Amino acid sequence: MNTQILILATSAFLCVRADKICLGRHAVSNGTKVDTLTEKGIEVVNATETVEQKNIPKICSKGKQTIDLGQCGLLGTTIGPPQCDQFLEFSANLIIERREGDDICYPGKFDNEETLRQILRKSGGIKKENMGFTYTGVRTNGETSACRRSRSSFYAEMKWLLSNTDNGVFPQMTKSYKNTKREPALIIWGIHHSGSTAEQTRLYGSGNKLITVWSSKYQQSFAPNPGPRPQINGQSGRIDFYWLMLDPNDTVTFSFNGAFIAPDRASFLRGKSLGIQSDAQLDNNCEGECYHIGGTIISNLPFQNINSRAIGKCPRYVKQKSLMLATGMKNVPENSTHKQLTHHMRKKRGLFGAIAGFIENGWEGLIDGWYGYRHQNAQGEGTAADYKSTQSAINQITGKLNRLIEKTNQQFELIDNEFNEIEKQIGNVINWTRDSIIEVWSYNAEFLVAVENQHTIDLTDSEMNKLYEKVRRQLRENAEEDGNGCFEIFHQCDNDCMASIRNNTYDHKKYRKEAIQNRIQIDAVKLSSGYKDIILWFSFGASCFLFLAIAMGLAFICIKNGNMRCTICI
């Protein structure tokens, strides 16, 4: 009877399951890997791509005043070759140059071409004003078959001045223009290099020719260089164009005695615009702010890996194809073993039997928040998210992407590589500088993202620790930590009690007496792992000693009774 009572009491004691509350974090089965300052490939619950790779192969022009120059080159709008007749004056905030576009008709070139192209791309369009030049003693209707309309003609905005008669004397002339506007005036003139000395004499008379141009900030003299050259558009001569920006109230003066291509109208810039050289099709159904030769980049990301020469409000170009920005906490998913044994463990060890600590693992079922609680008591088991700590972490992480964009986005200008021979060294420097900037920004981008990722992971761990400390301070001596993010509570804690722990309203004094009594009972029979090891070794040693003593005793008795004989041979 006494034995039966002892067995029942022992069984009841073993079946009692202590109330417990655990803290954990949200986890997913498959997270996203990010890099930090100290480690590569850390898995996080959420991450956002920061490098745009999707290109729209069209020029998105919705909401923009767009001009497609077609066969007209941008510089041609200032001098007026036949292909640019419809673009002599225009207004636009998006200027599209095509590869087929040409700036000239009579062969030649622009001095400092790329600088002028950049000015016009940002111009917002151009308007013109007549300069008021009149001429006597010369012809002003020079024309060429290279600039054909219905017949031979010339640049619409220029005057080709010739002697009144072939081989006739070209008089010395001086013409001045004062800019009375409030904005700078673009003044363009040309120097004609004849195909031969004989041709120059026929057009402008004999003798040396000299053209001098000056203003308050500019002075330059030009001498034509007649001579044979390869024919282009049927012409062996060349016209080189020069330009200056004339400040308000400043005056430009031209002094010449032949071989001078005179300006007819001054150009004024209208405002601001973007200019891009592209053969992509225009699309009025999409909007864009960032353009490149292959189309449009539409993105809110801070970086792009599409084109290093995109212009407008563009993400920074970087060499990396992907830079993941952590927007969630470090992910430690529940392992597959736990998933397979969940039901078995719950029966055998309770809800928490297969769950590692809040630092070592996460809970995939915690979907209402980033941090939360799981508990077990006499009323059952339950899970609840902690919204305050979740919101605190979210508030600090929200805006990380926007802050990266603010640090990296800027308006870019496109500088072409189409430099003439004189400008090639400058072009090489520009290209080297661009490549160096890309290298620097690629490194900076990786560093910025790594810093933000490090901060995010440290931040989310910090919030978890704060939550853990909050629970520990409430429970005090009423519970014991198990080292896995759980607290074993030494008193009965129903659902209301568990809720008070979560809500930070737990009154430890209310349960102190019961907790102390239960702690004493448990501590009386609890053996730590260190004591268990000592007892096991002691028990093993005692067993071995006892076995050896019994064996020696049996041998001694057998020898004494003559049942065993021991012979020693030397």
UniProtKB/Swiss-Prot annotation:
Cytoplasmic topology ranges: 555-570
Which keywords accompany this UniProt record? Clathrin- and caveolin-independent endocytosis of virus by host, Clathrin-mediated endocytosis of virus by host, Disulfide bond, Fusion of virus membrane with host endosomal membrane, Fusion of virus membrane with host membrane, Glycoprotein, Hemagglutinin, Host cell membrane, Host membrane, Host-virus interaction, Lipoprotein, Membrane, Palmitate, Signal, Transmembrane, Transmembrane helix, Viral attachment to host cell, Viral envelope protein, Viral penetration into host cytoplasm, Virion, Virus endocytosis by host, Virus entry into host cell
Q: Name one Pfam family in it.
A: Hemagglutinin
Membrane-crossing segments per the record: 534-554
Q: Which residues form the signal peptide?
A: 1-18
Q: Which cysteines are joined by disulfide bonds?
A: 22-486, 60-286, 72-84, 105-147, 290-314, 493-497
Which protein is depicted? Hemagglutinin
Q: Encoded by which gene?
A: HA
